[in-house]
């Protein structure tokens, strides 16, 4: 066993090349074992073991700086830099982040979780090094689809002119989360097919020196390659051909399925906990496919995450030309959706809440100023969604709801969601975003939802009319509002329950109507409070006698949190909200 004796890169440097091959096998076995229990990025890490071992073997981290794009491929790096217990000891599995984290190790230089940033960050480190007159290697590790993002192109454009040491490792595994899309990847294919010799070379055209490695999973070949580029005095791209999922046959054969996985059974590859009932992702894909069949101008759009709205490989094939994967390029997705709408098509862009912030300028400039009727489906907007600091899904309400011309809708159940989706696709007056419920598919509420929301613009649904206190439950939290109202009945209070439906405007008529028989308005939203929906209500009532109690999530970066504990810390449990209401009323 070699891995048990590796506590730093220095320990690894004592091994022979043959011993390093055995070390790689041990690391891969440990990765598969941990990921089968803990879940995480399977394929990307299994494919990067040899390259990471070779990089640490040849280079001198942390003096030499490694910047991993997204940093979801950094597990082997962590194993070699004093954190192997988090991959070999089940009691320590939760001790490290799934991404690089400077608080864990001096070998990690940035907290990274979104894509296409590594070259930009590395070029900054290289420039600072040059300004300070220092000497060390700066390495950006990018690939697994990340080259399709616009910032990657911007970073390469700048890095090519640095005129000093800068090594860009392109991990070419022929995949993103799903298959790669974009003209760049045709050039990568050409370079693979010609062993890096093709005269048409994107990286050389950008101004980089270039070196190709045909087998990036051969540790000896990778050591030779890193030895050639170490201490180089100009920018160079090291293009390595790797196998995503290397060493685990199910991950090799099912690359999209094993990009990231919940805990799985190693012998079969099956999830240990079967997928639950049909979610909003599958519901959305099936509904859009039916619309596409009837209307060839309906088009689904993804920025490298087709599963966000249920477009599995077979559904993408059924959609054909009516489905577009932009690569991991949210800016392109929003801008193109705007132009598709302008041209008479009916685009629907599905995106996770955490990634919509990557396209904020396009939302404002390309979409909303032009007032083009594209539809954006925002998934997983909730404290209960992704719980690491780089993927928080808490900020979409302030970001989206405050852009002029945008209509941001918050459905409360399956039927309301589908009526809003149908209206959004067919209407031609507004850009529309829909905050898709993130807490599982809620069934029918026995309500006749409108088929045309234009006459209903900003109108509340008064789900129950009571007195004393009105509880406004936004989207996910409408059910929470109902629960709190039921608890208040036990104290003799018949609370009004409101579904606001629209996050971009207020029903001032009904807000005025509440003044006559209510002394307290409570807002509940599953997102950050600052700049959110509740503040709109509080500002409306201003210095009047109406009390307003806003409940949501405090503004902070939180990492690897327990969802239940965070709801409690923000006083968002039914018992806490009920108690706070009673305290104010009394």
Task: Tell me what each language-model feature is.
Residues 108-264, 270-277, 281-282, 286, ...:
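Glycine-rich ThDP/TPP pyrophosphate-binding loop and its adjacent helix/strand module
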Residues 263, 271-274, 385-387, 407, ...:
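Peripheral docking tails and interdomain loops at the edges
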Residues 1-79, 204, 215, 239:
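N-terminal amphipathic, basic-rich helices that act as targeting or association modules
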Residues 39-48, 67-72, 101-119, 142-146, ...:
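Active-site nucleophile and cofactor-binding loops and adjacent substrate-binding regions
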Residues 29-36, 95-111, 133-139, 312-324, ...:
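Glycine/charged-rich beta-loop-alpha catalytic/anionic-binding loops adjacent to active sites
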Residues 86-96, 161-175, 368-380:
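A glycine-rich helix N-cap at a beta->alpha junction
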Residues 248-357, 362-372, 473-475, 489:
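Non-catalytic terminal/interface segments that mediate subunit docking, oligomerization
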Residues 41-162, 298, 303, 312-313, ...:
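Cofactor-binding active-site loop characterized by glycine-rich and histidine/acidic residues
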């Amino acid at each position: 066993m070699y891995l048990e004796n590796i506590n730093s890169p220095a320990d690894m440097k004592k091994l022979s090349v043959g011993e390093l091959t055995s070390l790689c096998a041990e690391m891969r076995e440990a990765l598969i074992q941990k990921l089968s229990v803990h879940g995480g990025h399977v394929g990307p890490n299994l494919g990067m073991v040899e390259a990471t071992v070779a990089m640490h073997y040849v280079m001198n981290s942390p003096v030499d700086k490694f910047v991993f794009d997204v940093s979801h491929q950094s597990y082997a790096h962590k194993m070699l830099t004093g954190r192997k217990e988090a991959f070999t000891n089940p009691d320590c599995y939760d001790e490290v982040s799934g991404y690089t984290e400077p608080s864990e190790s001096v070998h990690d230089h940035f907290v990274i979780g979104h894509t296409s940033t590594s070259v930009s960050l590395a070029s900054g480190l290289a420039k600072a090094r040059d300004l300070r007159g220092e000497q060390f290697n700066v390495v950006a590790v990018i690939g697994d689809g990340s080259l399709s993002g616009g910032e990657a192109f911007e970073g390469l454009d700048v890095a090519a002119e640095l005129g000093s040491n800068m090594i860009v490792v392109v991990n070419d595994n022929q995949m993103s989360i799903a298959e790669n899309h974009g003209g760049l990847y045709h050039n990568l294919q050409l370079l693979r097919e010609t062993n890096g010799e093709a005269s048409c070379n994107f990286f050389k055209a950008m101004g980089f020196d270039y070196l190709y490695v045909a087998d990036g999973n051969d540790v000896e070949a990778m050591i030779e390659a890193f030895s050639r580029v170490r201490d180089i005095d100009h920018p160079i791209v090291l293009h390595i051909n790797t196998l995503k999922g290397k060493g685990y046959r199910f991950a090799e054969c099912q690359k999209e399925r094993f990009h990231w996985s919940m805990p799985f059974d190693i012998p079969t590859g099956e999830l240990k906990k079967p997928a639950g009932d049909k979610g909003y992702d599958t519901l959305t894909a099936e509904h859009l496919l039916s619309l596409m069949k009837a209307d060839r101008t309906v088009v689904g759009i993804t920025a490298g995450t087709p599963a966000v709205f249920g477009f599995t490989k077979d559904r993408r094939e059924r959609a054909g030309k009516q489905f577009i994967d932009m690569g991991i390029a949210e800016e392109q997705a929003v801008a193109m959706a705007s132009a598709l709408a302008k041209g008479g098509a009916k685009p629907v862009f599905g995106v996770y809440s955490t990634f919509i912030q990557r396209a904020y300028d396009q939302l404002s400039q390309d979409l909303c100023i032009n007032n083009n009727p594209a539809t954006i489906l925002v998934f997983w907007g909730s404290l209960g969604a992704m719980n690491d600091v780089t993927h928080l899904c808490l900020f979409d309400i302030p970001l989206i709801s405050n852009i002029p011309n945008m209509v941001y809708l918050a459905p409360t159940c399956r039927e309301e969601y589908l009526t809003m989706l149908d209206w959004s696709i067919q209407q031609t007056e507004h850009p529309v975003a829909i905050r898709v419920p993130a807490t599982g598919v809620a069934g029918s509420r026995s309500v006749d939802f409108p088929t045309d929301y234009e006459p209903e613009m900003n109108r509340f649904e008064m789900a129950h009319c009571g007195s004393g206190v009105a509880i406004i439950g936004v989207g996910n939290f409408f059910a929470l509002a109902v629960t709190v109202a039921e608890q208040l009945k036990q104290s003799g209070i018949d609370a009004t329950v409101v579904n606001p439906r629209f996050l971009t405007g207020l029903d001032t008529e009904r807000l005025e109507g509440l003044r006559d028989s209510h002394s307290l308005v409570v807002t509940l939203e599953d997102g950050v409070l600052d700049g959110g929906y509740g503040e709109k209500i509080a500002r409306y009532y201003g210095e009047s006698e109406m009390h307003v109690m806003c409940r949501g999530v405090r503004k902070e970066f939180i990492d690897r949190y327990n969802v239940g504990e965070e709801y409690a810390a923000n006083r968002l449990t039914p018992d806490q909200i009920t108690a706070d209401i009673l305290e104010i009323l009394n």
